[in-house]
């Protein structure tokens, strides 16, 4: 696996810039559209061991965005021992699609990773879905929304992740919530807040108090409903921070949210305290 990754890395680096990726793989084809994910592996992986996986979905309102958004977070977490995946999905600006197709793709990505867990050296029972804004919606909805499955997927493979890390996620698509004008009457089955149920995966919810899209009161209500059904939801509020505060360009809060992610994953037993890695 690692030899293959290095060969692919060398090939792609000779042709164009791919950030931190060690491998770029197609995971889905719809008509003439191919969707890809980048894989970032920990160093010195042992064949006899399996590793947690973290799947990142970029933000952009299901309209714009790029899978490179979380490459710095993925690079750090790979050094900590997690196999990280940066996932493409269909968006309106490129594919003239709706948010419903975006969610279908997110579920396809989780299924693909779980199905091929042994090939990538991962534990299929330790898959963490993560994302920011609309990407946070997709991460949460893979766990909570029971519809919006691609008919060509292998539907007996679960798309439900084992944990969630949500960066100012869109979690309310109901009337008054983000995206309602596009989701419309489908919101009861599409909106994560409206689909919380027993067994929902443990969740880390990171939010700035000055977020103009995700009200703090909505996040607090989400946490309350999660706890009511017996699921863990750690809500961390960052004073005076706006929407998108966690991105790499806002380095102080990039570091803080990465450390919070590390601490959360340690608490689940997905990471050990060592090796210590500088967040940079």
Q: Where do the language-model regions lie?
A:
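Short beta-strand/loop motif that positions the catalytic acidic residue
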Residues: 205-207, 211
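N-terminal cap/lid segment of alpha/beta-hydrolase-fold proteins
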Residues: 20-49
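Primarily recognizes the serine-hydrolase "nucleophile elbow" in alpha/beta-hydrolase
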Residues: 68, 108-183, 187-188, 192
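Conserved alpha/beta-hydrolase "acid-adjacent" motif
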Residues: 212-218
């Amino acid at each position: 696996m690692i030899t293959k990754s290095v060969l692919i890395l060398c090939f792609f680096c000779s042709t164009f810039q791919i950030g931190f990726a060690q491998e770029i793989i197609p995971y889905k084809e719809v008509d003439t559209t191919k969707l890809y994910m980048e894989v970032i592996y920990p160093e010195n992986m042992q064949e006899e061991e399996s590793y947690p996986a973290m799947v990142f979905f970029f933000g952009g309102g299901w309209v714009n965005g790029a899978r490179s958004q979380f490459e710095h977070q993925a690079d750090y977490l790979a050094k900590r021992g997690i196999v990280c995946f940066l996932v493409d999905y269909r968006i309106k600006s490129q594919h003239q699609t709706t948010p419903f197709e975006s969610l279908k793709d997110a579920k396809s990505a989780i299924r693909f990773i779980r199905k091929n867990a042994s090939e990538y050296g991962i534990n299929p029972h330790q898959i963490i879905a993560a994302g920011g804004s609309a990407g946070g919606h997709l991460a949460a909805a893979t766990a909570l929304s029971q519809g919006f499955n691609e008919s060509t997927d292998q539907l007996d493979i679960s798309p439900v992740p084992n944990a969630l890390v949500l960066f100012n996620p869109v979690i309310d698509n109901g009337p008054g919530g983000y995206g309602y004008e596009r989701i419309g009457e489908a919101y009861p089955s599409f909106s994560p807040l409206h689909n919380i149920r027993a067994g929902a995966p443990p969740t880390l919810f990171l939010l700035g108090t000055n977020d103009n899209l995700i009200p703090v009161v909505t996040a607090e209500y989400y946490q309350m409903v999660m706890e009511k059904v017996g699921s863990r939801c750690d809500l961390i509020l960052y004073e005076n921070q706006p929407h998108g505060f966690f991105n790499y360009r806002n380095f102080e809060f990039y570091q803080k949210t990465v450390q919070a992610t590390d601490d959360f994953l340690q608490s689940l037993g997905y990471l050990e305290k060592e090796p210590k890695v500088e967040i940079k």
